[in-house]
Regions:
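Bacterial Sec-dependent N-terminal signal peptides
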Residues: 1-27
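Polar/charged alpha-helical tracts
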Residues: 2, 37-43, 318, 325-326
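Conserved small-residue
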Residues: 25-90, 96, 107-110, 121-127, ...
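Serine/threonine-rich low-complexity intrinsically disordered regions
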Residues: 1, 38, 48, 60-63, ...
Length: 328
């Protein structure tokens, strides 16, 4: 009898933990900005809007490792209010000033570029910071490629493209709804940016036929104030084969999984913490190796990541398999 009671207690403790944590997490606040109906209404880009040339308050940036989204390319721009700076005190997510807009546009190279534009834009996602609260929205580009309109819900777009090996692929690309955006960007009861952490911005850029360290470049532009760090960490590119399989795999999980699989994310109850900086013995990876690779390798409701992909990422799956095999 005592053994049965102990067993029931052991089984109920995780359930009680999840219930109590759900109560403490609360709800994500409603938007405190009114999103405009058209992307052009913001005046973020000058000239032909589809060229995505940022206005004078916008700065393009690149990440060391980026989210996989059905092999789509991305253009990332941060727009800051005039005279304001991004402030960083460690290698995580910096503080962005009130009024910051982060725009990320998704596109594929046009297969038939001889008879049309070089790229086909599908969507632009906006994060707008107002009063310390981030707000998320998505805009879908029209077939004329001269405007993107605010989406109230998700949308499906049939696309054809060439993958990294030059193979023609087809899929029904899914543009996320606001609810989908929140699912990935939510940390406890707040929405936060995912990509532009200092360690992920810590990479080399190619500008004017020369190379420059991106953090130094942003400081030179006068838009980044960063405290001296005893050790400025670097998130490696998971595509860089000069890095170890371990570092590449952990970087891959940081940008593709850890926004949900961390103690503050929406998948906290899985007891996986896939952040790059988390020690291996605290991640849960060793206990859930089969489940991790199994869910990456199937499509449908069981697929991971749950949002933003309709195609298996063959290169990512191979990388994670190699990493998990190295742990055995």
């Amino acid at each position: 009898m005592k053994k049965a009671i102990i067993l029931i207690g052991v089984l109920l403790i995780p359930i009680l933990f999840i219930v109590l944590n759900n109560k403490n997490r609360g709800k994500v606040a409603a938007d405190n900005v009114i999103f405009r109906d058209k992307l052009s209404d913001y005046g973020l880009f000058k000239g032909k809007i589809a060229d995505l040339v940022p206005n004078d308050q916008g700065v393009s940036y690149e990440l060391a490792s980026s989210l996989f989204t059905d092999y789509a390319d991305k253009k990332r721009v941060i727009f800051l209010p005039k005279g304001k700076k991004i402030v960083a005190s460690d290698d995580g997510l910096p503080d962005f000033p009130d009024g910051t807009i982060i725009a990320k546009s998704f596109f594929y190279p046009n297969i038939d570029s001889l008879r049309g534009p070089k790229s086909v834009l599908l969507e632009t996602r906006l994060l707008i910071n107002k009063g310390g609260q981030w707000n998320a929205a998505t805009y879908q580009w029209n077939s004329a490629q001269d405007e993107a309109v605010l989406l109230a819900d998700s949308a499906i777009v049939p696309v054809s493209f060439l993958d990294g090996k030059g193979v023609k692929r087809q899929t029904h690309y899914i543009i996320p709804s606001r609810k989908d955006c929140i699912a990935c960007h939510r940390q406890v009861n707040r929405i936060l940016p995912i990509g532009p952490k200092i360690r992920n911005l810590n990479r080399v850029l190619y500008r004017a036929n020369d190379t420059i360290q991106q953090l130094d470049y942003l400081k030179h532009l006068g838009i980044l104030a960063i405290s001296p760090l005893r050790k400025r960490s670097l998130l490696p590119s998971y595509e860089d084969h000069n890095q170890s399989v371990e570092r590449r795999a952990r970087a891959y999980m940081e940008v593709n999984c850890a926004h949900c699989h961390n103690p503050m994310g929406t998948a906290y109850m899985t007891m996986l913490d896939l952040r790059f900086e988390s020690p291996l013995n605290e991640t849960g990876i060793l206990l859930k190796q089969a489940k991790i690779i199994g869910r990456m390798s199937v499509l449908g409701e069981m697929h991971m990541p749950q949002k933003g992909t309709t195609i298996l990422h063959a290169e990512g799956i191979t990388l994670i398999k190699d990493y998990l095999n190295s742990l055995k």
